[in-house]
Amino acid sequence: MMHELDLRPHLARFAQRPLALLAWALLQGTSVNAQVAQVAPDEPPLPLKTSPLLQEQVAPALRSSLPTFISAEHIFGRPDLETVLEGRAELRRGDLVIKADRLEYDQPSDLATASGNVLINRAGNVYEGPLLELKLDTFEGFFNQPRYYFLKNDAHGQADRVDFIDDQRAVIHNATFTTCRRLPGPSWLPDWILRAASISLDNEEDVGTAKGALLSFKGVPLLPIPYLSFPLSDKRKSGVLPPILGLDNVNGAEVSVPYYWNIAPNRDATFTPTLMSKRGVNLSSELRYLEADYAGQVQLDLMPSDQLRDSTRWGLTYTHQATLQNSWTRPFTAGGVALNLNLNRVSDDNYWRDFTRASTGSLTQRLLTNDASLSWTEGNFSNTVRTLKWQTLQDVSAPITPPYDRLPQLATRYARSNVGGFDYSVDADYTRFQSERSLTLQPNAQRVFSVLQLSRPWVTAAGFITPKLQLNVSNYQFDTPLSNGARAASRVVPTLSVDSGLVFERDARYFGMNFRQTLEPRAFYVNTPFRDQRLLPNYDSGAVDFNFATIYTDNAFVGNDRISDSDLLTLGVSTRLLDPATGAQVARFGVAQRLRFRDQNVTLLPTDAPVTDRISDLLLGAAVNWDPKWAFDSTVQFNPTTKQSVRSTIGARYSAGHYRTVSAAYRYQRESSEQLDIGWQWPINDLWGERGQELGAGRGQGEGRWYSVGRLNYSMQERKLVDAVLGFEYDAGCWLGRIVLEQLQTSTASANQRIMFQLEFVGLTRLGVNPLKSLKDNIPGYQYLREQTSPPSRFSNYD
């Protein structure tokens, strides 16, 4: 029979020497049989209070002063000298539990000795073995022949001995380490196991360090590791990361050995030297920082000698965001000035083609932005000072005209709303446009424009109408004369528009389901007189894409160099089906079309023909989410004259739960492109009826599961795969295997291919090329089989 003593209420003065409580009890003749307090039926229940003992981490300063609870079948000893517990002996204090057949405590040395079926549970970490010696206050001691389990990463193993240095650090000698679930039976062997001469554990930093280690997989020695640092949780730590191996048809075999430097909680850096068999050595570095009023990231790739190009290659990306608040900003604004930097530079025109998987995705584009701006607001004013410079990476087979640099751009806006029912705003902008005239065939210039806008919205639940008057004023000063000899030009363009719409609602029932259905007709009229703009250079204007978002706008161009002459009426109607209980949209259908009352003579280029069609293409759109698992959307641009589709997009997605998603999209543009895009992630075991377990996102679906992942982009015009990602993942519980093939097209005649193979030993490390970024970027709805979640509570492994 077990008896328990709770000595806390009467013996607080012995709290610093916990087991001395027992000696005092023996002297006082306290019965070993604990007495249970009785509460009178008419007394109110005792109120619950928060306790520091229920915190996930017990503070070290608090731990030594906590009360101790002991129990055993037999308790005896000498006061102030020793106490002995025999038979199911148990000691509890804070987050520490010690169980054994026999437990001795020597009070002068504060040394506890436990023998026979000894178990320690400290904050969820468990050690079991035959013999323990431990100083309770300092947690110094040793444990012979222990078996152990660590809560944070679900790892376990056994060793010859554990030396406890203090309450946060320990050294395990001749140790094993694995996260594979132990199965019953003496013949069980884990799929992977790390054997080490010693493993040092630092629970304060959540870091484990193995020395003289050997990693075995499926019983085969895989990799000797003289030194390995691994995490005990998801906490960041400095150290060498697992090597990354790769095979590329352009760069050849690749070997990378990253080093991560955890500079501070708000700063870190990663250095990654990479050896490419065909090119040479590439040095990559990344620095991140985060402060209360600024944050940023710097990435630099340097290849001192590219053997294929016989030159030095480099790429730089720098982003920085800050809020400046000091003496020189106060005259402008009390809220501070926002600073934004986005700088991207590379060594040469071929960088984007040769390094398609650069550490910064922005460097794989052909137009690289270098943008710096200051912006601030004060009352109804908002202001921006900006410089924008482009680096254009030219391709001989497909040259592009570089956009204009803005050196500088000054913009301000003043806006008021609901002033006697009216809304008005004034926008002003000064920009200096600069580029290579030999490429743009236009003079550099300074442009000043201002847009004045006045509107009077009437809005009710049943509809709205908003008349608006707009005046666009522009002035140009050219560095060199235009073709007509002019060195300056001006333009004033007024615009009148009226936007209106109605909303009708009714209860409806379709396919046995109740809905709230809306009918929303909309009419938009715009009138802008013609102003001859054929001689004006074009610095920042382009044609507006024709879609549902732009069909109700007053200008056929974006930018400020072209203002289209318009006499248009846009008519459209949409209907929505809403869930009457939640208001969620179940389906939406829409149609819209423009009616043109006169020709549009303003065009993007002087050689372009005027727009004479009286009726525009018809836009048809639909989006259906009838079932939470299914999503369907489609947009069709139909030409009523030719009776043909000009552009169509049809997409569907099926998501049956975690790790089960399939998406398909068809995109067609007449005389330009026709593509089919399919992406998926799906458990292969479903094919033979094994549904797996529903463990939630980031935890997989149980052991022994295969997953197929991929995305295929097929050009039906060229009859070939443009881009492709295809692979398989295997989840064994304690390890994951991935093999992925990737093809990225870099030009009409060339593509980069690579194979990515990775073994992830859960809770320890990864070996191989990491395909996860490629899978996440390319496959819609892709989910990681393992993803960092909140650490488990110590009470989940409570004794």
Swiss-Prot record:
This is LPS-assembly protein LptD. Residues 1-34 form the signal peptide. Keywords: Cell outer membrane, Membrane, Signal. Coiled coil: none annotated. Component of the lipopolysaccharide transport and assembly complex. Interacts with LptE and LptA. It holds the Pfam family LptD. InterPro entries: LipoPS_assembly_LptD (IPR020889), LptD (IPR050218), LptD_C (IPR007543). Belongs to the LptD family. GO terms for cellular component: cell outer membrane; transporter complex. The gene is lptD.
